[in-house]
Design a protein with these regions (language model features):
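A charged N-terminal "starter" segment
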Residues: 1-19
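A glycine-rich phosphate-binding loop feature that marks nucleotide/adenosyl-phosphate handling sites
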Residues: 28, 76-78, 135-141, 247-259, ...
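FAD-binding subdomain of flavoenzyme oxidoreductases
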Residues: 96-100, 107-247, 448, 463-467, ...
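Glycine-rich N-terminal segment of FAD-binding domains in flavoprotein oxidoreductases
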Residues: 25, 32-94, 368-369, 469-517, ...
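Alpha-helix capping/hinge segments and adjacent helical runs
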Residues: 17, 403-415, 444-448, 651-654
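C-terminal substrate-recognition/cap domain of FAD-linked oxidoreductases
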Residues: 21-30, 207, 211, 217-394, ...
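Intrinsic disorder at enzyme termini
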Residues: 1-4, 427-482, 486, 638-664
Length: 664
């Protein structure tokens, strides 16, 4: 696109001419990321002061100039490609660690700070930042949030989404907002996680930091087949064992790593696991015996504990070097990023291997196995067009196989442009429509990283919607009727928190089934009207536990009321009826999902103002866990973003925001 000279003049005043570049070399350097996408921007701005972000966006908004936020550009999905031209906003120079507070457990950082920089600053203080993508030495913390990247420790500690406490954020029109986990209403930090720069620009982040465990023990375990190794992971999950890390790799990976990094991986096995435990010596000793027994049951060849810290670090250096090791073998590496329920790993592996063999593709297989996330690393030469087409086709088939196994097309690498089309494998039309509405609420002019994440012309390609249950169908009909006659209503369960005061209530009491307690994946799926008492009774009978209190109210109320914010991170899947009567579905039994906007976080704490949650899938545990602390219920005033999204979803105010109602 042609950028008006007046816009250049205004931008130059803000950032200085040395930071606004249009020369061919600069634009070529910023025309690509780690994907195959190559698109030349019209200009490049180096952002060296956080205070200029909002003024820059105001100018871009005034002149309707699209922009792409960019830091280290380590993503594999084309998220940094400037598809509509416009301006690349390089936040990498904003790389200061502003504050570290070990007493309260947080750090404030600028968006260009890398994970490695933060870890180096924390280590002498005896602290660490839990998310650990393999590229943490170079990838930025804002990029991690934008992609919801996770890494090896996700199984125990969760992904980036779970470790961001506050952010300063700039909307595409230049409006600055501050978001905190203490805010009432929907979890907007969670919604921004994984949004790939399509909703605005991250200015600063406050991240959670944790004390380094005093005792950590790492094991290298070898197997005669990759199937045996991933079955081990499924069995660990089924036993409720949660190691600090569980990484798997095949012999193609180990050979490449040994030639490059000399990590000490045995070459006489078809697969290996890196398992890591932390805790007290007694806890580690108990779990070590369980680990070894499960590994032996699955035909392990060697069970080797790291004897020194140097040996432990060497094992992890090899794992982090896997991508670079494969990149030495060919001009290009295409990295897949599917996630399936942990119990489905063996079946997914079988499907993936069949696809790669049928296409005669040479690839390594690498897994964040503890959370069902795997990365086929396919080597090829993009200058060979038939080869590139074949590889791209195979990877799409791999992602379809993930969806067929109840999984997602992205666990942590995002969607960008390269996986945009396959979103239709995973989501039906109403859910994709909701993604569009979320984008429009934040960015009505579609200037922020346009044409990413959401498929183009998806109406006929979207996944067919599964049938609605009888109770859900009845509620959908009631919603449509009330919309038709303009009869606003309040969504209620047991009326334990909200006094309806004679208002037209819409009850979830007919949604009262516990649909599945899955002790293989350690998840439960239940309808929103199930009472917490009945749920607690059923879990106790099944010998499993959740963080939900055994008190008044329903599952849907616990999730939507805002009284149990620590429960949000436990929720993996959701179904909800929107104010137009359509049903949206997101997630499932997945420990990771970076495909699309996080709808679980949109409805969390939304107090029934955006739609009626019909069912949830959430984590359970093999051992007792502390109950979530409960806050008093107060009807919240609508946050700027809350009001904007509500206007998109519910323009007729069918489910009103009523501030000031007290707990009952």
């Amino acid at each position: 696109m042609k950028i008006p000279s007046a816009a250049f003049a205004e931008l130059t005043k803000i950032v200085g001419k040395e930071n606004l570049l249009t020369d061919e070399v600069s634009l070529s350097v910023y025309a690509y990321d780690c994907s195959l996408s190559r698109t030349r921007p019209d200009a490049l701005i180096h952002l060296r002061q956080a205070e200029v972000i909002a003024p820059v966006l105001k100018v871009l908004h005034a002149y309707h100039i699209p922009f792409v936020p960019r830091a280290s550009a380590t993503n594999h999905a084309g998220s940094c490609a400037a598809l509509n031209g416009g301006i690349i906003l390089n936040v990498a120079p904003l790389n200061k660690i502003l504050q570290i507070n070990t007493q309260e457990g947080f750090a404030w950082v600028e968006p260009g700070v890398t994970g490695g920089d933060l870890q180096d600053a924390l280590a002498p203080l005896g602290f660490f930042y839990a998310p650990d993508p393999a590229s943490e030495r170079v990838c930025s913390l804002s990029g991690n949030l934008a992609q919801n990247a996770s890494g090896a420790r996700c199984m125990k500690y969760g992904g980036t989404i779970d470790h961001i406490l506050e952010i300063d954020f700039v909307l595409p029109d230049g409006t600055e907002i501050h978001l905190s986990r203490k805010d009432g209403g929907p979890d907007f930090i969670g919604l921004i996680a994984g949004s790939e720069g399509t909703l605005g620009v991250i200015k600063q982040l406050k991240v959670r930091i944790l004390p380094v465990a005093k005792h950590i023990k790492t094991f290298l375990v070898t197997f005669p087949s990759l199937s045996d190794s991933v079955q081990t992971v499924s069995d660990l999950a089924a036993e409720g064992i949660i190691p600090r890390c569980v990484e798997a790799m095949d012999d193609v990976t180990t050979r490449a790593v040994e030639e490059f990094a000399h990590a000490g991986y045995p070459l006489d096995a078809k697969a290996l696991l890196i398992l890591e435990l932390d805790g007290t010596p007694a806890e580690i000793s108990e779990q070590e015996k369980q680990l070894e027994d499960i590994c032996l049951k699955n035909h392990s060849l060697k069970f080797l504990p790291a004897k020194t810290e140097a040996e432990r670090q060497k094992l992890w250096f090899g794992r982090r070097a896997a991508y670079a090791a494969m990149a030495r073998l060919a001009p290009n590496v295409m990295v897949g990023d599917g996630t399936v329920p942990r119990s489905e790993l063996p079946r997914a592996l079988e499907k993936v291997r069949r696809i790669l063999d049928e296409q005669h593709i040479y690839a390594s297989l690498l897994f964040h196995a503890g959370d069902g996330n795997f990365h086929p690393q396919i080597i090829f030469d993009e200058r060979n067009r038939p080869d590139t087409v074949r590889v791209t086709k195979a990877l799409k088939e791999v992602l379809q196989a993930c969806v067929d196994c109840g999984g997602t097309v992205s666990g942590e690498h995002g969607v960008g442009v390269e996986k945009r089309a396959v979103m239709a494998y995973q989501y039906d039309k109403p859910t994709l429509d909701l993604f569009v509405q979320i984008k429009h609420a934040f960015d009505p002019d579609h200037l922020a990283n346009p044409l990413k994440l959401i498929p183009v012309n998806y109406a006929e390609k979207a996944r067919e919607q599964a049938p609605l249950s009888a109770a859900t169908k009845q509620l959908a009909e009631k919603i449509l009727l009330r919309k038709k006659v303009h009869a606003p209503c309040l969504i209620t369960g047991e009326n334990s928190r909200l006094k309806t005061k004679g208002a037209n209530a819409l009850s979830t009491q007919t949604l009262n089934r516990i649909l599945e307690i899955d002790k293989t994946n350690y998840t439960v799926t239940a309808e929103a009207g199930v009472t917490l008492k009945n749920l607690a009774r059923a879990l106790t009978q099944a010998g499993v536990y959740s963080i939900l209190p055994n008190g008044k109210g329903t599952l849907g109320g616990a999730f939507c009321s805002g009284c149990l914010p620590s429960f949000y991170a436990q929720v993996l899947g959701i179904e909800a009826l929107l104010p137009d009567g359509s049903l949206v579905r997101y997630g499932g039994k997945l420990m990771k999902n970076a495909a699309g906007y996080h709808l679980t976080r949109l409805f969390a704490g939304s107090q029934g103002t955006l739609g009626l949650v019909t069912r949830l899938t959430f984590k359970i545990y093999a051992k007792p866990v502390p109950a979530a602390p409960e806050k008093p219920f107060v009807r919240e005033n609508g946050h700027l973003l809350w009001a904007s999204i509500k206007k998109q979803l519910d323009p007729g105010d069918l489910f009103p925001i009523l501030a000031g109602e007290k707990n009952v």
